[in-house]
């Protein structure tokens, strides 16, 4: 058998150590160009002028941005509204609808459909649409029989 050369392993080990000690590339704080117009030109001729108004974003972490990245306090959570009071507000505003909605003679886009008490009402149309949509699931679960 051939004797292994330890110099190769030492060189490999030194390369790994030097590679791990090298400095990582850091992004510079500045402007990021998102979109710019590039002029049509030959490859050997430099562009006449660069785009005068590229779409850019300023990536400098200003004090305003850094202030927004702090943890939320209890006061911040106390100011959040869950929207639970919206339903009361909606029912208060809709109690006095001007007119009796149950006595409509005919609904639009329905031939011969009455507003209340008929089989062609909106609720029956929605119900049948939902049932047709759920039919494949009922077949899979065996509930359609």
From Swiss-Prot:
Disruption phenotype: Deletion of just fapA in the overexpressing strain alters the fibril composition; fibrils are shorter, more stable and are composed mainly of FapB with minor amounts of FapC. Deletion of the entire fapA-fapF six-gene locus shows no visible growth phenotype. GO terms for cellular component: periplasmic space. It is found in: Periplasm. The keyword Signal applies. Keywords: Chaperone, Periplasm, Signal. Residues 1-27 form the signal peptide. Its main location: periplasm. Belongs to the FapA family. An intrinsically disordered chaperone for fibril amyloid FapC that guards against fibrillation, pro within the periplasm. Upon overexpression of the endogenous six-gene locus (fapA-fapF), cells form large clumps during liquid growth, make large amounts of biofilm and produce relatively unstable amyloid fibrils. Monomer in solution. Interacts with FapC but not FapB in vitro. This is Functional amyloid chaperone FapA. The lineage of its organism: Bacteria, Pseudomonadati, Pseudomonadota, Gammaproteobacteria, Pseudomonadales.
